[in-house]
Amino acid sequence: MEHAPLPLKDVFHLSPPRDRPSLAFPLGLGDAGLHEICEASHGDFAAMTGFALAARAHRKGPIVWIRQAGLKQSHGLLLQAGYREISTNISPCLTITPRKLSETLWATEEAIRSGVAALVIAELEDTDFTASRRLALAAGRHGVPVLLLMPYSRDGATAASARWRISPRPSSPNRYDPKAPGALCWKAVLERSRQAPHMAGQSFDLELDDETLSLRVVSGLAADPVATRPSWAQDRIGPSHLRQSA
């Protein structure tokens, strides 16, 4: 007995293609998953905060900002005036200041699981692989992007999608007044990347677009190796209008 061949479309049911994370800058930062953003040197915390706010994807909904008390004393608080100068989307922001690292990690995970936050930002003194994995799994499960802001001493293994190392750069020339400061600029080094490991060590020269308040790459992708960070660090002057002393 002969059987007529079945069309392939009746045999195989192809699933729709899954969205893959973009391999272009900033690799999904603030849009999906867990990203670490770290100082390149001591004193870069204000510049690092500005980078995080400018580079993040703009999602509707409140931000939960968790700040470990020790970092609040060392690096100050976020100024709303500076926030408005660097971001077009001024979302409602709930600030939490736990005292201990363990409390900060717990609050971060609870914020992810709350179902309320569109973005969770946590300032931590440090973390380990196990804690970062818990946060990464929670971020993926609940679809909430997470940014961890950490000092220059951060090192070691991580479960984050990427680790960025941020330093300020001299502002670009002001086209209206050559004696006045121009747009804010940063250097961002992709120190680690799970979705694009071949890009680890690449650096981006970035500038804040004053009209759109978004970051643009001004010199393309450079194949600079990650510089070895010294045990001591030279103080830098970041965008001082962004944070104030506690």
In which residue ranges do the predicted regions lie?
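Solvent-exposed alpha-helices and their adjacent loops that cap or buttress functional pockets
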Residues: 29, 112-113, 140, 156, ...
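A contiguous pocket-lining binding segment that forms or flanks enzyme active sites
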Residues: 118-177
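Long, charge-dense
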Residues: 66-127, 142, 150-155
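Detector for small/aliphatic-rich hydrophobic stretches
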Residues: 1-65, 69, 76, 82-91, ...
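A broad, low-specificity signal marking well-ordered, structured residues that form hydrophobic/aromatic
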Residues: 35, 164, 188
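A short acidic, amphipathic alpha-helical/loop segment
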Residues: 48-52, 107, 131-135, 139
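C-terminal functional extensions of proteins
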Residues: 170-246
